[in-house]
Design a protein with these regions (language model features):
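Solvent-exposed, non-transmembrane regions of integral membrane proteins
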Residues: 1-750
Length: 750
């Protein structure tokens, strides 16, 4: 019995170590290397098989079948492994390329081996569906015919993103298309048995999880009945400090020339094609200001004032230290002190571009110190030039002669030769007229000209522009630029709460009811702010805002507050957790990019399964973060000189209670993601670094759910230290993969 137990858990430990090493090797040697020598290798498969068999024998010896729900839960995992093994043996995956009008009867696997199909595929037509009024693709659709000689029949089918065509257990997925739009690339998967077994495992896992939480015999229900929970609970946070370098402008520094605010706002009210999306010009102005300065406001000026300042008062603005330079190497090349450069700092006294020599080295592939920082500084210089010449201001829509397609142009673009003369003159001259009115300070006339441009936009687009409500909603959302301030406020409030609750715990006093009411009011204010920001962003983008790192961290902060509201009645001292964790996640969301642009969603990301997958996993991460902070609190209390044994035990029970839904949500989230991946591109598991680290996280935390087999987890302090250490896997899963290891899930890779 002991030998089986030690063998099973030792093998699991070896698997975790191999998976960890594999993700590092993938970064060094590439995906093909680890797929061939680790993930698809026979020894790796045998190791999983031996681990599964040993675990099954241990489960039987432990007489776990006497607890049907727990037994089914473990059995579901074995089903999933059995499905993966079946896929490894019988499954076939490959790629098929077919031209329009051509017939194809085979596909090629990753090793270049051709596999014959028992039928033929003919591509009748390939089409790209675009988002309204833009050239951003919304979906790729292939219309196909299948000819089956054995059955003497021919059927019609359609393959598109998130829409599979299946025939005789062969599944076809739209994975690409030819450059001339005359051909399609299909991912082909033939897995007649593995998918069914795996999905049976997923279903069994979901059902057994639900039954577990409702079973009176489950350990989760027993923990809820613990007498320690019916006394005053104390849950406290440890705050780790964020060092924020703030740069303040001197109050007496002169402001550059700008338009009157109401005139600048008229500019912000125009439509623009930006980032393959029709949006308010205000959005472009905001992103432009953030790109240059790192904030949407400069010296109290609005983004519209900053943008129009560069457009109409270039000589004044080129002397402004508005360009944020993060790279020390770039600062040396520009010969500046401090973090901000002026545009004229880029040009030497002999009228040479200071970064030109270094950029030539970069373009030629030479090794350069801080290549990324220099490229970023160069990019900002080029963006200003493109804005000041009007090249980025695509504010003039124009239909072609047939009226079928809509193109957007800037004043400086090459216009079609067959364009109507009146349109040509309007596009070429209207902004010049606006400039003349501004030079003569005839601001009312300038506003009238801007209104004419907007009427031209509305007439030319005719039904393709965003709805008025959506347009206004985006302008309102652009005002929600206070995440950093909210984050700092939450951290400060959380710190005060932390000190206050520590004092109450040490002196055995009850927390003030007034303090709790005030904290709840503040929590509601932050929750309302976040809810409004997330809803507006989702409404404007036409999809759940969970498509990048910024959005998922904002959603995690929202989940944290929601969980605080739901749990604080049972665990009243969770209140500091809510503030601190919300503040930290909001601060993290601001680290990579102040606020990424709203973009059209890639076709493959339009599945509702993806949104559910991200939501469930973000909630799980929030719960695991609570547990980690709970553990930190326990360690602080343990190190104090006062007797806090009972409080530490309470913290352990709270963490154990939260741990069950956290792990089950993480497991369900992983497998929902697997179903989405199978629907989207034909494989439910691809050993992507984020998939691997999510699996590692789930398995590591699952160890803490086995105190009978691993008696160390009965020790209170061991449990808390384990939960703190285990949170490293969550950090690697999210940040390590996104910014270091890379992979298909990496937000940093776009």
């Amino acid at each position: 019995m002991k030998l089986l137990k030690r063998t099973a858990f030792s093998l699991l430990g070896i698997l975790l170590l191999i998976l960890t090493i594999a993700t590092i090797l993938e970064k060094i040697y590439g995906t093909d290397f680890v797929n061939e020598y680790i993930y698809s290798s026979l020894p790796f498969v045998i190791l999983w098989g031996v681990t599964a068999i040993t675990s099954l024998l241990y489960i039987i010896k432990s007489k776990l079948h006497r607890q049907p729900v727990i037994f089914l839960l473990h059995l579901s995992l074995l089903f999933i492994l059995a499905g993966a093994f079946t896929t490894w043996i019988y499954g076939e995956q490959g790629t098929m390329r077919v031209r329009q009008g051509e017939q194809q009867t085979s596909f090629t696997d990753s090793k270049g081996i051709s596999h014959q199909l028992p039928f033929s595929i003919t591509l009748n037509q390939f089409e790209i569906i675009y988002y309204k009024g833009t050239l951003a693709p919304m979906d790729f659709i292939s219309h196909i015919s299948v000819a089956d000689k054995d059955c003497h029949r021919q059927i019609q089918g359609k393959v598109s993103m998130n829409h599979i065509f299946s025939y005789q257990h062969y599944r076809f997925y739209q994975s690409g298309y030819s450059e001339d739009n005359e051909g399609s690339v299909f991912s082909v998967s033939h897995d007649p048995y593995g998918i069914g077994i795996t999905y049976a495992g997923y279903t069994l896992l979901l059902l057994s999880t639900v039954f577990f939480f409702f079973s009176p015999q489950s350990r989760f229900r027993q923990l809820l009945k613990s007498p320690l929970l019916h006394r005053s609970l104390t849950v406290i946070l440890l705050l780790f400090a964020f060092s924020l370098n703030s740069n303040f402008l001197k109050a007496n520094s002169p402001s550059p020339k700008v338009l009157p605010r109401e005139v600048a706002e008229h500019f912000g009210d125009l439509y623009i094609l930006y980032n393959n999306r029709i949006c308010p010009l205000q959005t472009f102005a905001r992103d432009f200001t953030i790109k240059l300065y790192g904030s949407s406001s400069y010296k109290g000026l609005t983004p519209e004032e900053v943008l129009t300042g560069w457009l109409f008062y270039y000589d004044s603005w080129k002397n402004e230290p508005i360009i944020r330079i993060k790279s020390n190497e770039a600062r040396k090349l520009l010969e500046i002190e401090g973090n901000y450069a002026r545009l004229k700092d880029y040009i030497s006294t002999i009228n040479e571009y200071k970064l030109e020599k270094m950029m030539n080295h970069i373009r030629s592939g030479e090794q350069v110190t801080d290549k990324r920082g220099i490229e970023e500084a160069d990019e900002k210089f080029n963006i200003i030039n493109l804005v000041c010449t009007g090249a980025m201001m695509k504010i003039f829509p124009c239909r072609n002669i047939a009226g079928k397609t809509l193109e957007w142009y800037s004043q400086s673009d090459q216009l079609p030769q067959d364009m109507d003369n009146d349109k040509w003159v309007f596009i070429r001259k209207s902004m010049s007229y606006v400039n003349e009115m501004i030079v003569m300070k005839k601001y009312n006339d300038a506003c009238l000209l801007l209104e004419k441009i907007k009427k031209y936009q509305q007439k030319e687009c005719d039904g393709l522009l965003p709805a008025d409500n959506k347009f206004k909603a985006e302008k309102i959302y652009n005002q929600f630029d206070y995440s950093k301030s909210v984050a700092m406020a939450c951290i400060c409030i959380g710190l005060i709460c932390f000190i206050y609750y520590c004092h109450c715990m040490a002196s055995q006093k009850r927390t003030s009811r007034k303090a709790i009411i005030i904290l709840n009011i503040l929590l509601w204010i932050v929750f309302t702010y976040l809810s409004a920001a997330i809803c507006l962003r989702g409404y404007v983008s036409n999809h759940l805002p969970l498509s990048n790192g910024f959005e998922t961290m904002q959603f995690m902060a929202w989940c944290t507050l929601l969980l605080t509201f739901l749990l604080q009645r049972k665990f009243a001292m969770l209140l500091p957790f809510g503030f601190l964790l919300c503040g930290l996640t909001l601060m993290v969301s601001m680290l990579g990019e102040s606020n990424p642009q709203i973009t059209q969603l890639m076709p493959v990301l339009q599945s509702p399964l993806l949104s559910i997958h991200v939501v469930v996993i973000m909630i799980a991460y929030s719960l695991l973060a609570f547990i980690m902070l709970n553990g930190v609190t326990a360690v602080i209390l343990h190190q104090s000189q006062k007797e806090c044994k009972e409080q530490i035990e309470r913290l352990q029970i709270i963490s154990q209670i939260i741990l069950y839904p956290a792990i089950f949500l993480l497991a369900i989230g992983i497998f929902i993601g697997a179903v989405w991946a199978n629907v989207s591109w034909g494989r439910y598991w691809g050993w992507d670094p984020k998939e691997v680290w999510a699996l590692i996280t789930m398995l590591v935390y699952a160890l803490a759910l086995h105190p009978r087999s691993l008696p160390w987890f009965h020790r209170t302090m061991f449990f808390h230290v384990f939960c703190i250490t285990a949170f490293i896997t969550v950090l690697i899963t999210y940040f390590g993969v996104n910014f270091l290891l890379g992979g298909m899930h990496s937000y940093a890779n776009g």
